[in-house]
Regions:
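Alpha-helical transmembrane segments of polytopic membrane proteins
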Residues: 129-138, 188-195, 238-246, 271, ...
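Juxtamembrane loop-helix boundary motifs flanking transmembrane segments in multi-pass membrane proteins
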Residues: 17, 123, 195, 199, ...
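Short helix-perturbing small/polar motifs within transmembrane alpha-helices
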Residues: 140-160, 164, 169-184, 201-291, ...
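Acidic/His-rich, divalent-metal-binding segments that scaffold phosphate/diphosphate chemistry
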Residues: 217-219, 266-347
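Juxtamembrane helix-loop transition segments at the membrane interface in multi-pass membrane proteins
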Residues: 2-18, 181-195, 217-225, 257, ...
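Membrane-embedded alpha-helical signal segments
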Residues: 1-164, 295, 316-321, 347
Length: 347
């Protein structure tokens, strides 16, 4: 009898515990529904970029086209499960059920042309690659939400700041994903030229402080990693180099800009950031033993990226302040200066 009462009491306590947790969870969702909705919209937008990224990627049945070459003895058999008609760009016809390459046989030029045809066709989408990329993106969004929901910033995180970060993340993610598919920016060292991550981190640091900018730097860097990772299980320099460069450049930008007080100081920030970006490319090329003839062009490109990021940050700062209804340290310094023309008129 006592045992039954104890079991009944335990079950009642468990139900109360579950109800309390459900109530707390419900209240938390109500309090942060706008942030959760915004994160969900950002995730769906990034997923759309992911889909087009994977659909236009050079992967065949979860294997990368770069793993094959003419004359190589195939280590697996790849069979076409869909027919692909010939076109002007690639006049090769692929029949459904046709074995493109056979394990143990060398790959001919015709075989490689068919592999390339399959990789470029939107009819062949690497589902595993897309799922891997989506899982990484989901974990990234969860980490993002946890950081900005539970880390003590000493101030209230406004929804306007989250909107700004999500928009900037999508711009960086999209430019990295699609820029790496162009021939001129296909190298992991050249793709960093067009990644505007440092620009957004500078604006974030000026408007919302260094801590937010550092966290945002990690989010952007992980986004760049996923955009160049293609959902593969092989971590190569093609995704590591852009990730490390973006992380170093963004964290450096957030550290450099923290003590400036005048707008003219942004020119110095631009020069210093250009030098840091150039040094990072040289260091990464040494670490990964990269030797290529276009290194001087890449160095000029990343230096320009760093310099123009600081200049554009200064130019975009005023309209961003207006749109986000916030004030930067420059605006506060102007208002505290009694010699400022605006203050003279008010006085």
């Amino acid at each position: 009898m006592k045992t039954k009462k104890m079991n009944l009491n335990n079950s009642v306590q468990e139900k109360k515990g579950v109800q309390k947790f459900a109530e707390k969870f419900k209240n938390y969702v109500k309090a942060h529904y706008s942030v959760i909705l915004l994160m969900t919209i950002g995730f769906l937008a990034a997923s759309a970029i992911n889909f087009f990224n994977v659909a236009t990627g050079k992967t065949i049945a979860s294997f990368n086209l770069e793993e094959f070459e003419v004359g190589q003895v195939a280590d697996r058999t790849i069979q076409a499960n869909k027919s692909i008609p010939a076109d002007e760009m690639n006049p090769v016809f692929i029949e459904e059920g046709e074995k493109i390459i056979r394990k143990g046989f060398p790959i001919s030029e015709d075989d490689y042309a068919k592999l390339k045809k399959m990789s470029e066709s939107p009819m062949y989408i690497d589902i595993r690659s897309f799922a891997n990329s989506e899982l990484f993106l989901l974990l990234l969004m969860t980490l993002w939400f946890m950081l900005f929901a539970f880390v003590p910033f000493g101030r209230k995180i406004l929804i306007r700041e989250i909107i700004f970060q999500v928009v900037c993340f999508l711009v960086v993610y999209g430019m990295t994903a699609f820029g790496s598919k162009t021939q001129i920016f296909s190298s992991p060292f050249s793709i960093v030229i067009i990644i505007p991550a440092a620009l957004f981190v500078l604006i974030e640091a000026i408007l919302y402080g260094q801590l937010s900018a550092v966290f945002f730097s990690f989010m952007l860097s992980l986004g760049v990693f996923n955009a160049t990772f293609f959902g593969s299980f092989n971590i190569t320099p093609s995704c590591v180099v852009p990730f490390l460069f973006t992380l170093a450049s963004c964290v450096s930008a957030s550290m450099i800009v923290r003590k400036i007080e005048r707008r003219i100081d942004m020119v110095v920030v631009s020069i210093v950031l250009a030098l840091i970006d150039t040094m990072m490319i040289v260091i990464l090329s040494v670490i990964f033993n990269e030797v290529f003839n276009r290194l001087p062009i890449v160095l000029i490109g990343v230096a320009f990226n760093g310099f123009i990021s600081g200049i554009l940050a200064l130019g975009f700062l005023t309209p961003v302040e207006f749109m986000l209804n916030t004030a930067s340290v420059f605006r506060l310094m102007d208002l505290s200066d009694l010699n400022n023309p605006l203050m003279k008129k008010m006085l």
